[in-house]
A protein has these predicted regions:
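N-terminal hydrophobic/helix-forming segments and targeting peptides
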Residues: 1-169, 173
């Protein structure tokens, strides 16, 4: 019996953490949780600000439990002249934890573009300061997996300052 609950909890955890949901971009994760509560027989309510309320019932004094569904992420801070992007963190995201991570950029048109965060001068064999360079959001850039060599070409893909949310992908572990 205990392994049934554990397996269910692990399946739900995997499903939830794989839904892109940086702060301000949580509607899909909230819908998923709402549907799961409804499937269990509860009556979830999505608030006007996108929160989720679920009365679990019970007896005695009431108890309020709170949790958050959002994850860390970033947003486009600058479209650089070379077509790369400079990003700003959303939440407590730390630059030194993002280098070489795959990111998904969500355009307003619903298009998802992939890219990689890396040091601006990432050529270890020619950059003598590579290991000494502090990783900050001023020294990292996002290179899209698209052929762009200018700000105009990147903007033509639907990417611009402040409009595109970025989901920092976690490595897959099995």
């Amino acid at each position: 019996m205990q392994s049934t609950y554990l397996n269910y909890a692990l399946r739900q955890l995997e499903a939830i953490v794989n839904i892109p949901s940086p702060s301000g971009f949580t509607a899909e994760a909230v819908r998923y949780c709402s549907n799961e509560f409804a499937n269990m027989g509860y009556t979830p309510e999505i608030t006007p600000k996108g929160g989720l309320l679920v009365c679990l019932g019970g007896e005695g004094e009431g108890l309020l439990l709170g949790a958050h569904i959002d994850t860390l992420g970033a947003m486009v801070r600058e479209v650089k002249a070379n077509g790369a992007l400079r990003v700003a963190p959303v939440g407590g995201l730390q630059a030194n934890n993002t280098e070489t991570e795959t990111v998904h950029v969500y355009t307003r048109a619903g298009k998802v573009l992939e890219g990689t965060l890396q040091l601006e001068n990432a050529s270890v064999h020619v950059n003598g300061e590579y290991s000494k360079t502090q990783r900050t959001f001023d020294t990292l850039e996002l290179l899209l997996d698209a052929k762009t060599h200018s700000a105009a070409e990147t903007r033509a893909l639907g990417v611009d300052v402040g409009l595109s949310l970025i989901h920092i992908s976690e490595p897959t572990r099995h």
